[in-house]
Amino acid sequence: MDVVSRFLLWMEAERRYSPLTLRNYRRDIEEFARWRGVTCATLDFENIARKDIQDWLYYLSDRRKLKASTVNRMLASLRTLWRWMLAHGHVSKDIMHGVRQYKTPRALPIFVPDTRMRDVVEELRSDLASEDIWRVRDALIILLIYTSGMRLAELVALNDEDIAADCRSVVVMGKGRKERVLPLLASLGKIIKKYFSLKYSQNICIAEKKALILSKKGVRINCRAVQRVVEQKLKGVGVAGRTSPHVLRHTFATQLLNEGADLREIQELLGHSDLRATQIYTHLDIAKLRDAYHKAHPRERDDEDSGGTRDDSAHI
């Protein structure tokens, strides 16, 4: 077994990383191997220098035109592999020391405005009233993410047994294989019960009887299929811009913050290990306040009336 395969097995067993995370690690390492003109199995790690890593990052950024966040993720995958190899005696020097990440702009999370989200929920009512399991399933996908804030990978990995008997909570497996319990709305619990009833009465489970969300082939749905469902439903009611499961997750967190939820409570629900990851939503709230200030403050209106030439210090 080659070094990379052993590293991934260790990550699965010791770090309890999800299959999706492990695939991402392998893909990033394979990308580096291809750039070197070899495979993961034939990478000669002892003959790789710091400059090789820096040249690869330059290639990704300047030739491939990848975003800084993508380049940094790929670097992080290789850096984690290298630390593991150092600890297990597969390499003798730390070439990653001194290799810096690319600077990334701090982008505010994209979310669906509350009024537009009401349109989405209203549009789902006909699906929820249907006896067509696939229409009910699609509505359930949207509502599970929007009302619980779970990640795409967490949704796809759900099993029937993860739903509490009363359908008022769900256990999800987050990053680092960390479990957390998410509350579910009573109305959503009724939808889940209906979905269960349709699913088992029609006996559509073929290969994966445990999986909660199924494809039309009767097996566990994949991430891309969920993305298509979300995109179709959101664009169908006129939601502009990005329409991904992660946008629904951002919408969940943004609405909680706007309704006065504590930041640490939101952190727990989202499964963020670091509060700083959750604090980005406070920046969003500050941006909203700033916009409201510019629209409503009387001195701001005075400034607009004067063409922006007035000495503000004399009028405050």
Model-assigned labels for residue ranges:
Residues M1-I316:
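Conserved catalytic core of the tyrosine transesterase superfamily
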